[in-house]
Design a protein with these regions (language model features):
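Blade-level signature of beta-propeller repeat domains, shared across WD40, Kelch, NHL, RCC1
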Residues: 421-450
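WD40-repeat beta-propellers
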Residues: 104-109, 148-152, 172, 190-194, ...
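Blade/loop signatures of beta-propeller domains
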Residues: 14-68
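Hydrophobic beta-strand positions that form the internal "hydrophobic ladder"
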Residues: 95, 137-139, 181, 221, ...
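Loop/turn segments within WD40 beta-propeller blades
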Residues: 86-92, 129-134, 172-179, 206, ...
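Conserved strand-to-loop turn within each blade of WD40 beta-propeller repeats
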Residues: 98-101, 140-144, 184-187, 224-227, ...
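Inter-blade linker and blade-boundary elements of WD-repeat/beta-propeller domains
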Residues: 53-78, 113-120, 157-164, 168, ...
Length: 450
């Protein structure tokens, strides 16, 4: 799946076959080390989830069903604010968070501890991403000139700036193969950049809430066109030409049962499946996500909450967030404590200038990181307004007769406090992170029968 010629031919995959799953290996227990290297309890108790996952080991639905919060960082973000993005480095050693309080934190996945805190009070921070240098990151600004900033974690300074976007950046992705990256801004443009130059080398005008993604080869890019409920695929070497495939998401039959004319939820996230990348995950702010065939454009599955509840962060999502914030405030007031921590925080003048991404496009939701594939591509994980974590198993054999069928979750996890705005699965270990008003590290509980 490295070239555009391998896409868009109905009935033909054209790319390399998907890698065969590696033989299932037992998850180690009693080793004194938990998933991601988190220390096991000193007393030898197995009440804390313990596991080690090799990159060659495939996950199972039974393992995912027993994931539980192993550690919760209740003060990972200022009260009344949310974490808006999560990112692991390529080795899975560190987790980077960005939040509405203009703080980005670096956590050690091996130690399960906060390693370092950084501030971007002047520019704000969103969509923090590791580059191929583990000590350098990219992030979008939430105010000012809408620039993208290249930051050294080791030196704690900005190395360069990428200016040109005329509105707030809504999507930012690093190429998986080199030092180029891609960004999208609301109602403005998609741009291609290189870390070695401050000027974009590619630009495409667009409307609506921009969302972008690379395939695993870095040669094909996907752009969501919300105003057309479509995904367009480009050969990155021919970005200035027309897309080689336009995928129109036709979900009118199901959506018309909710409202007529059917109202399509805003696309907030897209991701090619790891490996062969023959499917595309289309995350939305509404009550459904989609699995799309990357070669034919067919709608394979509708990911819904089933009996587990409603997924998505909009339109009910904001109400749930507000309700959770109100409950937190009420709990603080009931404590009757005096001091700075109990006062309503109005924020600085600079903080007040920050505009949520959702304000640019109605229905865009409150995150762009609410769903993702697991590293083996076998499962999809999603947060929700209620805090529940939904997990779906990706079918291994898609049949045309089942196209557009609802896919119910194989597991629904409970334990995240407040809306789970962001989820991210560690690329190397059996560790899941979820975030919103709090940050949680999840590990499989091997006391359960897996």
């Amino acid at each position: 799946m490295a070239t555009s010629q391998q896409y868009g031919s109905a009935g033909q995959v054209g790319g390399p076959s998907a890698p065969q799953p590696a033989p299932q290996q037992p998850i180690a227990s009693g080793s004194g080390v938990s998933a991601g290297g988190l220390p096991a309890p000193a007393n030898g108790s197995t009440s804390t989830p313990v596991s080690i996952l090799s990159t060659s080991v495939t996950l199972t639905a039974r393992q995912l069903a027993v994931f539980k919060p192993a550690k919760v960082f209740s003060e990972a973000v200022k009260r009344g604010k949310d974490i808006t993005s999560l990112a692991y480095d390529a080795k899975g050693d560190y987790l980077l968070t960005a939040a509405e309080d203009d703080v980005f934190n670096l956590y050690s996945c091996k130690k399960g501890k906060l390693t370092k805190t950084f501030y971007s009070k002047k520019y704000g921070i969103d969509l923090a991403r590791f580059t191929h240098k583990p000590d350098c990151i990219l992030h979008a600004s939430t105010r000012g000139d809408n620039s993208i900033r290249f930051h050294s974690l080791q030196e704690n300074k900005y190395l360069s700036y990428f200016r040109g976007h005329e509105s707030r950046v809504t999507s930012l992705q690093m190429s998986p193969v080199d030092d180029t990256f891609m960004s999208a801004a609301a109602n403005e443009s998609v741009r291609l950049w290189d870390l070695k130059s401050s000027k974009a080398f590619g630009k495409l005008r667009m409307q609506g809430h921009g969302v972008v993604a690379y395939d695993s080869s870095g040669q094909v890019i996907a752009i969501a066109l919300n105003e057309r409920a479509a995904i367009v695929l480009y050969d990155i070497k021919q970005f200035e030409k027309a897309p080689f495939l336009t995928i129109r998401i036709d979900d009118s039959a199901a959506l018309s049962q909710i409202s007529y004319p059917p109202r399509y939820p805003t696309i907030t996230y897209i991701e090619f499946a790891p490996g062969a990348g023959n499917t595309i995950l289309v995350g939305t702010a509404g009550g459904v996500h989609y699995l799309i065939d990357a070669f034919t454009g067919a709608l394979r599955r509708r990911l819904v909450g089933g009996q587990g509840g409603r997924i998505g962060l909009e339109p009910e999502g904001l109400a749930a967030v507000d309700a959770y914030a109100a409950s937190e405030k009420e709990a603080e007031e009931e404590k009757g404590n005096e001091g700075e921590g109990d006062k309503t925080e109005e924020g600085t003048e600079e903080e007040k200038k920050a505009t949520p991404r959702s304000m640019f496009v109605p229905g865009a939701g409150i995150s762009g990181s609410e769903c993702c594939f697991t590293p083996d591509g076998a499962f999809i994980v999603s947060g929700s307004a209620t805090g529940q974590i939904f997990m779906w198993q990706v079918p291994t054999d898609f049949r045309e007769v089942d196209n557009g069928r609802n896919l119910d979750p194989v597991a629904v996890l409970h334990g995240h406090q407040g809306p789970s705005r962001c989820v991210a699965f560690n690329p190397r270990t059996a560790m899941l992170a979820s975030a919103g008003r709090k940050l949680a590290f999840w590990l499989p509980d091997l006391d359960e029968d897996v």
